[in-house]
Amino acid sequence: MPLEEILSRLPLKSTRAVRSTCKKWDSLFKNRSFISKAAAAREGESQMVVLMDHNLHLVSFFFGSDTSVEIKGKRICLNDDSDSEQVKISQVFHCEGLLLCILKDDNFSLVVWNPYWGQTRWIKPRCSFEIPQGCDMYRYAIGYDNKRRNHKILRFIDYEFHYPRDNVVLWYEIYDFESDLWTTLDVTTPHWLINCGNRGVTLKGNTYWCAKKRNSDLFLNADHIICFDFTSERFGPLLLLPFSDLDGVVTLACVREEKLAALVCHEDVVEVWITIKIEANEVLWSKFLTVNVDLGDEIPSSLTYGSFFIDEEKKVAMIFDKTLDRGDTVHIMGEAGYGGQVDLGEPVNKRRCPLVCSYVPSLVQIKKPAGFQRKQQSKLEKRQYVRNISKLRALKTQSSWTLSMSLECHQQ
């Protein structure tokens, strides 16, 4: 068997050790055509990153001729030293091979990681805002400027507290990898509302969320999607979802970094749609799958709060879920109907559903800070920062929520 074919079949976690063995092999792993060949060598295999019990797992799913599936996976670690205490992760977001990791026990560190290269970049947020039980009130997204391929992180808190009355916490900010600076975005009267806990998915550099009109009924489910354009650093208009009935809860996923998928679960039907055209200001949908299910016996309703994965070629959808009696599970659905579930084991954390995102190895290099070339914050940005911090401090004095601020904020 030729050397290239042998190396192309290596599991991702072994490539770093192999590359360090020989310069010729290292240069081979940097070749784009070789990366494509390696992906093709795994035909029939769907690869994804799954977050369970605050640990990341690189998981491969091998689909049979029907909805049967074989699962193989191992934990992957940010730490190079396997003997050291591993970093615990509370959230993970994916953008073309890069993972944005939100840490469980460190409110003042974000990590961007390329598992293929083993590269990391640690980033300091400017402040942290939590409610009791340690719930991070911020939402996150990672994307890039399509003109310069410069990566950025969007971080925002947009939440209305009913006690104390009439307190709205609203702060959108963006981190630029080139400048190594956080900047407050001009978002003062948003026309959209992204429900707390709603996860965005990044596609072709931009991030999409399920959303609804700002002044709509509090208990109304999301009936639109909205895009944040990392090039213009602005949100687009609300775009309609394709469903005629929105009684079910909707969630989004990315299909091999090419399309967006939307899943809605009603009482007895699961629908999945995928995009045939998607831009910041326009989206067209095509129905991918409709499966009749019996929620009473087979699928618990809590699955709608989990995440899902689509294999477009195999015409299969997998929904990740958590139940009290069975632990973490994957529900398999295809054209033939509901194909049953796969047990992922008993979790330590009984409350959190496993999170999943599709994964394709990437040659993208994570930019490092420019060092002495680093830009200074503008006077306007300093004033905006002080104003937002003052608002959060005022809220803290009226409530039981905890506000803590980094002593290493990027104010110059």
From Swiss-Prot:
Classification via InterPro entries: F-box-assoc_dom_typ1, F-box-assoc_interact_dom, F-box-like_dom_sf, F-box_dom, SCF_F-box_component
Domain F-box: 1-38
Protein name: Putative F-box protein At3g22940
